């Protein structure tokens, strides 16, 4: 599987659009700082609702996006 790590919330959206053609059903996207700013929260919402994404996990400090669209679209918030 391909794992892509988006470190910079300010440039994450353009990086996501750039790597999107390389992602497949086995890909995982790690998004840092999903709650650190208004822009980061908006991007996280956009990724969660994108029809090309499947299961998402909100870990508070980062988010995980899986692209296996064969599974039902689902969002989880993990509190620990």
Placement of each model-derived feature along the sequence:
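C-terminal substrate-binding/active-site "lid" region of AdoMet-derived donor-dependent transferases
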Residues: 11-80
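A short acidic, Gly/Pro-enriched loop at the edge of an enzyme's catalytic core
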Residues: 1-4
């Amino acid at each position: 599987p391909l794992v892509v790590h988006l470190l910079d919330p300010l440039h994450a959206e353009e990086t996501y659009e750039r790597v999107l053609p390389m992602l497949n059903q086995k890909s995982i996207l790690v998004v840092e700082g999903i709650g650190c700013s208004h822009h980061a929260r908006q991007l996280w919402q956009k990724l969660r609702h994108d029809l090309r994404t499947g299961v998402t996990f909100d870990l508070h400090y980062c988010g995980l996006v899986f692209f296996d669209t064969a599974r039902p679209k689902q969002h989880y918030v993990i509190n620990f």
